[in-house]
Amino acid sequence: MEALLQSFRMRLDLTPTAYVRSFHDTINWNNRLIGILGQKGVGKSTMILQHIKMYDDISESLYVQADDFYFASHRIYDLALAFFQRGGKKLYIDEIHKYSGWNTEIKMIYDQLPLLKLVYSGSSVLDLKKGAKADLSRRTIEYFMPILSFREYLNISKAWNLKTASLDEILSGHIDFPYGEHRPIKYYKEYLQRGCYPYFSEEDFIIKLKQAVIATVEDDIPKYAEMTVAASVKLKKLMFMLAQSVPYKPNYTTLARDLDLSRNTLPDYIDYLEKSGLFNALREKSTGDGLLQKPEKLYLDNSNIIYALGLDKSDAGTIRETMFLSWTRHMCAVYSSKISDFEIDGITFEVGGRNKTGRQIKSAERGFVVKDDIEYAVGNTIPIWMFGFLY
């Protein structure tokens, strides 16, 4: 344990606290068992270390990574017990999905060490169902950490302190932006290519992001789904087929034939890609379980992934719709619209470029046109970048 403590202290010393994502404040850190999930690279590890550094009694806290060599010969439960017996009160376990059988041991810690608070993080939601097998779903409070919003990107890259905006504020054009000396469209276009992840300023950003995407498809999902090598190859092929066709309107019969897959198996593969955070599914509004519905369209999660996969020649309309859905889905229930592109709380949204008109939303009870090359909101026409201030 001493080596783990030394590694923890070193990581803590190297953790910056100049900027902490506002997502931190959405978490109730007083809960006994907290799960923080999200894509690789969105900043889960940094946020956890920042929380410890800023709010915890360091002598009573321990942060470990589940893929540490220490766990090749030690159980997480045994570490938790030894740490608790030494006076430990808060244990943070990062990359929990990399530890085989983690869900069972987390349940043991929760049940047998009731005075020890536990926070775990995972790079995706891939192990959610496995955790449920150990009844974790009734014990843990889980949070999903999204990509950086446009607002967060500006605050980090420009050292600003811009505030979030509600959907109503955005629809009325009330956004906290320093128009006097700065142009939002310029920064928005930068963000589209490399602004969705906290390491956007690193020189090899695109390479790292592509590696993270491929690792999710080649390693994380196959491990979760207990796939054969042949099946994992088909999953990777499916991912690239979908990525090159977004927004993709699923035709299960054609896809299954092209991949030599059972039509009954294909929905599971698409579900894995959605749960991994790489894709977002747009569905019709339903009174039943929406997750069981076949998606109307599939989008990559964000435009940075589009560029990282070398799909930068994608239609501008695809990128617009991708980011509108990516931002709004974290704060609102978003559905496909029967007369236009999207529907949120009964409001219809048509997403387009400078020449987009409101023709398609004329029959909507309440509708807005969302454009990507304007700076100001005028009437029911809203700049798309403003939706990047929702969180």
Question: What spans do the regions from the language model cover?
Answer:
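Structural recognition of the conserved hydrophobic beta-strand(s) that form the central parallel beta-sheet
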Residues: 117-123, 144
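A cross-kingdom feature that marks ATP-driven nucleic-acid transaction machinery
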Residues: 1-17, 27, 53-54, 66, ...
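Interdomain hinge/linker elements that couple catalytic modules in large macromolecular machines
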Residues: 2-7, 151, 158-303, 307
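Short regulatory helix/loop adjacent to the ATP-binding pocket of P-loop NTPases
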Residues: 126-141, 157-158
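Short glycine-rich substrate-engagement loop in P-loop NTPases that contacts/grips substrate
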Residues: 58-90
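Conserved lysine of the Walker
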Residues: 44-45
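Hydrophobic anchor at the beta1->P-loop junction of P-loop NTPases
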Residues: 36
